[in-house]
Regions:
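Soluble or luminal CAZymes and related metallo-dependent hydrolases
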Residues: 34-41, 87, 228, 297
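Rossmann-fold NAD(P)-binding glycine/threonine-rich loop
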Residues: 4-75
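Alpha-helical scaffold segments in soluble metabolic enzymes
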Residues: 44, 48, 71, 90, ...
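Carboxylate/His-rich catalytic cores and anion/metal-binding grooves
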Residues: 1
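Rossmann-fold dinucleotide-binding core
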Residues: 52-53, 57-126
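Small-side-chain structural scaffolding
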Residues: 46, 50-56, 83, 233, ...
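Conserved aromatic-histidine-acidic binding/catalytic patches
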Residues: 30-37, 56-60, 79, 83, ...
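Long, compositionally biased stretches enriched for glycine and/or charged residues
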Residues: 100-352
């Protein structure tokens, strides 16, 4: 379907029903409707993979990452299925300036949910010195002036850092992403996010995507020398083929005690080990229980979204809305679900 038309419906129709969601791609009511459209199609693809080439390594880039991955890994637990996202690349851009060293001298451990993760540990490789003291010293000044560069668009200094600063102040850890994604998962986000900057980002991202084929050839865009997207799929495949046993900074896999505060089998974003067996998650020791409570708030709505997708259940979709921290009105939630199914019947009409 029309990605941006549907996205804007996911965003605006819930707001008409009282939702205070801020982005509507991965979390909140919009994240649910996005999931209900795209997850069934990816599950169908994986149904075929399981029949034709069950030992294949399968990588997903589609959002909403944790809900798509959870639906697939619930139905096909033996499939070698991994979610990938380039959001972690922000650390490579930012930490060298903050820590005054090359990124090759920095070791990080980050994790949480996709688009809702934090830098748990960071240190200098040469000295093994903790990197957080200097990050904390320079944090406010650096991020207040930081300009986000994305798809040829430059933001105002400090844009999309309202919730970002609030989370750092409250929990003491560096968020990996900015307000547009962080705000999708928190019921109080709407009162602190930089909504104007989120809107600017969305409008410029939409403009860039819709003019993509007018400005650059497909082959040029994906040429390795010119690709600034920091996608890691090729190095990951190489590491699997070569049985390298190297660590990847961020992969999305079902939780197996990698983050102790999140139920097992909920898909989490953690470091991963790459070898001939594929991708294996790495446990994040000392993950803060405080931030872990925010992750845990998402578990129920993720599980119910999967149930709605796999069982074509409208009731489960409704319960997924009620489980979402961003939803605070059960009557409007029912009206919203009915309105969205009616509005997007082509994609959501399977829910009975």
């Amino acid at each position: 379907g029309d990605r941006f038309k549907l996205w804007e419906e996911d965003w605006k129709i819930p707001i008409e029903h009282g939702s205070k969601q801020v982005m509507a791609e991965n979390g909140g009511p919009g994240g649910l409707f996005h999931s209900l459209r795209i997850a069934p199609e990816i599950v169908k693809i994986c149904d075929e993979i399981s029949k034709i080439c069950p030992d294949a390594f399968v990588f997903n880039y589609s959002n909403p990452m944790q809900r798509v991955c959870h639906a697939v890994t619930t139905k096909h637990p033996d499939l070698k299925f991994t979610g990938l996202c380039h959001e972690i690349a922000s650390m490579e851009r930012q930490l060298p300036t903050l820590m005054e060293t090359d990124y090759s001298n920095i070791e990080i451990k980050a994790g949480g949910l996709n688009h809702f993760s934090i830098l748990v540990d960071v240190k200098y490789k040469d000295s093994q010195k903790d990197g957080y003291p200097i990050i904390r010293k320079k944090f406010k000044d650096y991020y207040s002036k930081l300009i986000n560069e994305h798809e040829g668009f430059s933001s105002d200094p400090g844009a999309e850092r309202g919730l970002f600063f609030e989370l750092y102040k409250m929990y003491g850890y560096l968020p990996i992403t900015t307000d547009s994604h962080l705000g999708e998962y928190i019921q109080w986000a709407h009162c602190v996010v930089d909504q104007e900057a989120i809107n600017d980002f969305y409008n410029n991202y939409k403009k860039k995507c819709l003019s993509f084929y007018d400005n650059v050839s497909y082959s040029t865009f994906f040429d390795k020398k010119n690709n600034e997207m920091n996608e890691r799929i090729i190095p990951i495949i190489e590491a699997i083929i070569e049985d390298s046993n190297v660590e990847e900074e961020a992969v999305n896999v079902p939780n197996k005690n990698f983050i102790e505060h999140v139920p097992n089998n909920i898909v989490v974003e953690v470091p991963g080990i790459l070898n001939k067996n594929g991708v294996s998650g790495v446990r994040l020791e000392n993950y803060p229980s405080t931030f872990g409570t925010l992750l845990n708030n998402q578990a129920g709505t993720i599980e119910l979204t999967t149930d709605a997708v796999l069982n074509k259940s409208k009731q489960s979709a409704y319960l997924a809305l009620l489980a979402d921290p961003v939803v605070d009105n059960s009557i409007e939630a029912q009206k919203l679900l009915d309105a969205m199914i009616d509005h997007q019947d082509k994609y959501l009409g399977y829910l009975k």
